[in-house]
Swiss-Prot record:
PROSITE patterns per record: L_LECTIN_LIKE (PS51328)
InterPro entries the UniProt entry points to: ConA-like_dom_sf (IPR013320), Intracellular_Lectin-GPT (IPR051136), Lectin_leg (IPR005052)
Gene: Lman2l
Record-annotated disulphide pairs: C199-C236
Organism: Mus musculus (Mouse)
GO cellular component assignments: endoplasmic reticulum membrane; Golgi apparatus; Golgi membrane
PANTHER family (UniProt xref): VESICULAR MANNOSE-BINDING LECTIN (PTHR12223), VIP36-LIKE PROTEIN (PTHR12223:SF20)
Protein name: VIP36-like protein
Transmembrane segments: 313-335
Main subcellular localisation: endoplasmic reticulum
Biological process (GO), any one: protein transport
Residues spanned by motif Endoplasmic reticulum retention signal: 343-345
Length: 347
C-alpha cells in the first residue's frame, strides 16, 4: 500500500484559516443571539423580555425635550451625555424621572443602574434616591422628591441617617415600603415604622458600577443589588404576599436639603417575566385594586378610635350613675338585713 502524501504548507495554512474563520463566525452568531430578545432566567424557570416602552438607556434621545418621549423630567433633573442627573451636589434641589406609559405586566423585573457621589464627607451628604411603582406620577413632595402618602411601591436608597440610634444600622441603607395612600413616610425614623425590610448598601463614592434589581413575581417581592464589582446579585429584601395593582407608573426621584450629593441614573431596564405561572396560579392570582401586604401589621395602619358623640357620652354617664345608685341601694338593704339578723342573735 502506497504511503499517503503529506499535505503541502498551502493546504495546512488553508485548514488553519478555515478553523479561525469558523470560530469567528460562531462567535458572531453567539453575539448576535445575545441581543434584547428573550432569555432564560434562573435555571429556565422564566423567560424575560425587555420592554422598551418602560426602559431607558443612553443616548436618552428626546428625554426632557420631545413631546413624543416616553419619559418626563421634573424639577432640577437634567439630561447629560452619560447619565440623567436627578439632583446636583447642591443644597435644596429635587428632581425626578417618570415613565409616561402605565405598566400592565403581571410579573416583571426592573434593573436600575445608578450612581451616588459628591464632595461631602462622612454623614455630611444626602439624602439619597427612590425608585417608584405608583398610581400617581410627577407629584413633587418630601419623600425623596415624591409625594407623601403615595399609592404603590417605593424603594429607597437612603444615604443619611436622621434617627439618633445610628448604631442599629449602617448607612447607606436600602428599604422598601408598600402604601395604600394612608401612611406617611417617617423621616425622623428613616422610614423604619413602615418598611418591609432592608439592608446596608455601601453605594456612595465607590469605583464600581452600582445596580439594583426589583423583581415582582406571583406576589413575591425581591430586591437585590450588585455594588461590589463582582457581577453577582446579592439579596437585600425578600417579601411574599405583596399585592400590587397593574397600571401604575415607574419612576425615580431624589432630593437634597442642607446636605447634598449628585444622584445619577444611568439606565432603567424593565423585563417582562413569562412562564412563571401555572393555569391554577393564573386563576388564583386575580387582579388587585389597592396595594397591600399579606399578614403584615404596621403601626400606622391601626385605625384610631372614633370620638364619642354627645348623645353616646350622655347615655354612658347616665347609665353609669343609675348603676352606681342601684348598687348603693342594694348595699344599704343588705347591710340593714345583716344588722337585723345580728340583733336577733343577741335577744
Amino acid at each position: 500500500m502506497a504511503a499517503a502524501s503529506r499535505p503541502s504548507w498551502w493546504q495546512r495554512w488553508r485548514r488553519r484559516a478555515w478553523a479561525r474563520d469558523g470560530a469567528k463566525l460562531l462567535l458572531f452568531l453567539l453575539l448576535l443571539g445575545s441581543g434584547p430578545g428573550p432569555r432564560h432566567v434562573r435555571a429556565g424557570q422564566a423567560v424575560e423580555y425587555l420592554k422598551r416602552e418602560h426602559s431607558l438607556s443612553k443616548p436618552y434621545q428626546g428625554v426632557g425635550t420631545s413631546s413624543s418621549s416616553l419619559w418626563n423630567l421634573m424639577g432640577n433633573a437634567m439630561v447629560m451625555t452619560q447619565y440623567i442627573r436627578l439632583t446636583p451636589d447642591m443644597q435644596s434641589k429635587q428632581g425626578a424621572l417618570w415613565n409616561r406609559v402605565p405598566c400592565f405586566l403581571k410579573d416583571w423585573e426592573l434593573q436600575v443602574h445608578f450612581k451616588i457621589h459628591g464632595q461631602g464627607k462622612k454623614n455630611l451628604h444626602g439624602d439619597g434616591l427612590a425608585i417608584w411603582y405608583t398610581k400617581d406620577r410627577m407629584q413633587p413632595g418630601p419623600v425623596f422628591g415624591n409625594m407623601d402618602k403615595f399609592v404603590g411601591l417605593g424603594v429607597f436608597v437612603d444615604t443619611y441617617p436622621n434617627e439618633e440610634k445610628q448604631h442599629e444600622r449602617v448607612f447607606p441603607y436600602i428599604s422598601a415600603m408598600v402604601n395604600n395612600g394612608s401612611l406617611s413616610y417617617d423621616h425622623e425614623r428613616d422610614g423604619r415604622p413602615t418598611e418591609l425590610g432592608g439592608c446596608t448598601a455601601i453605594v456612595r463614592n465607590i469605583r464600581y458600577d452600582t445596580f439594583l434589581v426589583i423583581r415582582y413575581v406571583k406576589r413575591h417581592l425581591t430586591i437585590m443589588m450588585d455594588i461590589d464589582g463582582k457581577h453577582e446579585w446579592r439579596d437585600c429584601i425578600e417579601m411574599p404576599g405583596v399585592r400590587l395593582p397593574r397600571g401604575y407608573y415607574f419612576g425615580t426621584s431624589s432630593i437634597t436639603g442642607d446636605l447634598s450629593d449628585n444622584h445619577d441614573v444611568i439606565s432603567l431596564k424593565l423585563f417582562e417575566l413569562t412562564g412563571v405561572r401555572t393555569p391554577e396560579e393564573e386563576k388564583l392570582h386575580r387582579d388587585v385594586f389597592l396595594p397591600s401586604v399579606d399578614n403584615l401589621k404596621l403601626p400606622e395602619m391601626t385605625v384610631p378610635p372614633t370620638p364619642l358623640s354627645g348623645l353616646a357620652l350622655f347615655l354612658i354617664v347616665f347609665f353609669s350613675l343609675v348603676f352606681s345608685v342601684f348598687a348603693i341601694v342594694i348595699g344599704i338593704i343588705l347591710y340593714n338585713k345583716w344588722q337585723d339578723q345580728s340583733r336577733k342573735r343577741f335577744y
